[in-house]
Swiss-Prot record:
Belongs to the GTP-binding SRP family. SRP54 subfamily. One of its GO terms (cellular component) is signal recognition particle. SMART domains: AAA, SRP54, SRP54_N. Coiled coil: none annotated. Its EC number is 3.6.5.4. This is Signal recognition particle 54 kDa protein. It comes from Archaeoglobus fulgidus (strain ATCC 49558 / DSM 4304 / JCM 9628 / NBRC 100126 / VC-16). The gene is srp54.
Length: 433
């Protein structure tokens, strides 16, 4: 992922024995390398690195901090200044128009955004106004059906403006209407004319440009062209997890002064989040994003109507994992949870646990169905002979049973660490931890 190496910079600062001029200069070089590798605009790289170096060598250490904490604070603040502002779309009635080039992930983003707002209590509808790509109508219809979202489209209709006009009439009772428009390989006149006409008819509250993170610094040229055409007021960066060039899209947004509204960090519907600059930079440095984690937990706990008592009483068994496994599926891979915790709380976790999938979670349920009540309540008694019996009974292998036990131990250790570090873990109790 873009800017991943910044975590190593933060670790070196936190683990350094002394902070001197030589250390600062080397640290700044590493930050420069990380930013350039992520395709951040060279001018912006110089601005950020110069500011960090100047402040690190000249500012007095604040009374409440030590030298390492002061340096981390400076790096954090200057990177935060570098990523620019975020755009928070409030939970109220609004029309949103998505634009972008072909292949940017616009249609998928339309559905993900609709699900995002639906999960937060809004009545949402999506409009299929991409009449150029034959598969766009069916793709959006299927995604809307999967996520339980109102869909409007007119199969075979070539007039996108007419579709939008009819949709607005039919969807008046919805809180949010999200319009998916046509994408192109380039900004052709015909596309620009259609976008302008749709914007005139829809009068959207938000015109959001969808940018593929993989295009790097080319994002700046695209963003400027769309902005001049219809006046975009927000950006969504997609596929941020799958490229080393995501910094280019971030710097493009800052260059033209357009805030980032959302970022897509994976293929799943839950891999879509509001862009919070402070939390984003904090995660880049491996310092976590507790606020985002708590928000996610509170929402999922509310959806699942989970009882926090088990964890709050200090108990955590395999039975708790069984009951709350669906909620964990919604949280996403363990890796994504750890990214929201400061330096992963120092826990060493196997890759197979980090990349826990829904398929694996389902298999865990089958394994637990073959356990006795005593084993579920007291996993410590599960020895090698019990593991063999459980594997045979569940139609799995002893290795898979061990994976479940390893996952259980990891999550239990995580909770202990969070309690020890006095992190706000009450919300985690709602997931049965």
């Amino acid at each position: 992922m873009a800017l991943e190496s910044l975590k190593e910079v933060a670790r070196k600062i936190a683990g350094s024995s002394s902070i001197d001029k030589k250390f600062v200069e080397e640290m700044v070089k590493e930050i420069q390398r990380a930013l350039i590798k992520a395709d951040v605009n060279v001018r912006q790289v110089k601005e950020i690195s110069d500011a960090i170096k100047k402040r690190a060598l000249s500012e007095d250490v604040l009374p409440a901090l030590n030298a390492k904490e002061q340096i981390l604070k400076i790096v954090y603040e200057e990177l935060l200044r570098g990523v620019g502002e975020g755009l928070e779309i409030p939970l109220k009635k609004a029309k949103i128009m998505l634009v972008g080039l072909q292949g940017s992930g616009k249609t998928t983003t339309t559905a993900k955004m609709a699900k995002y707002f639906k999960d937060r209590g809004m009545k949402v509808a999506v409009v299929a106004a991409d009449t150029w790509r034959p598969a766009a109508y069916e793709q959006l219809r299927q995604l809307a059906e999967e996520y339980g979202i109102t869909f409007y489209g007119e199969k075979g209709e070539k007039d996108a403006v007419k579709i939008v006009k009819n949709a607005l009439e039919k969807l008046k009772d919805h809180d949010m209407i999200i319009i998916d428009t046509a994408g192109r390989h380039a900004l052709e006149d015909e596309l620009i004319d259609e976008m302008i006409k749709i914007a005139e008819v829809a009068r959207p509250d938000y015109k959001l440009l969808v940018l593929d993170a993989a295009i790097g610094q080319l994002a700046s040229k695209q963003a400027q062209a769309f902005h001049e055409a219809i006046g975009i007021n927000g950006i969504i960066i997609t596929k941020f997890d799958g490229t080393a060039k995501g910094g280019g899209a971030l710097s493009a947004a800052r260059q033209i002064g357009i805030p980032i509204a959302f970022i897509g960090t994976g293929e799943k519907v839950e891999d879509f989040e509001r862009f919070d600059p402070a939390g984003f930079v904090s995660r880049l440095l491996g310092m976590g994003d507790i606020k985002a984690l708590m928000e996610k937990i509170e929402r999922i706990a509310s959806e699942e109507e989970l009882d926090p008592e088990a964890f709050l009483k200090g108990t955590f068994t395999l039975k708790d994992i069984y009951k709350q496994i669906e909620a964990m599926n919604k949280m996403g891979p363990v890796r994504k949870i750890f990214e929201m915790l400061p330096f992963g709380l120092g826990l060493k976790v196997d890759n197979d646990v980090m990349e826990m999938t829904q398929e694996k979670m389902k298999k865990f349920r089958v394994i637990m169905d073959s356990m006795t009540e005593e084993e579920l309540l007291n996993p410590k008694i599960i020895d090698s002979s019990r593991i063999r019996r459980i594997a045979i009974g569940s139609g799995t292998s002893p290795q898979e049973v061990k994976e479940l036990l390893n996952y259980y131990k990891t999550m239990k250790n995580l909770m202990k660490k969070m309690k020890k570090n006095k992190l706000p873990i009450k919300g985690l109790g709602k997931l049965g931890f």
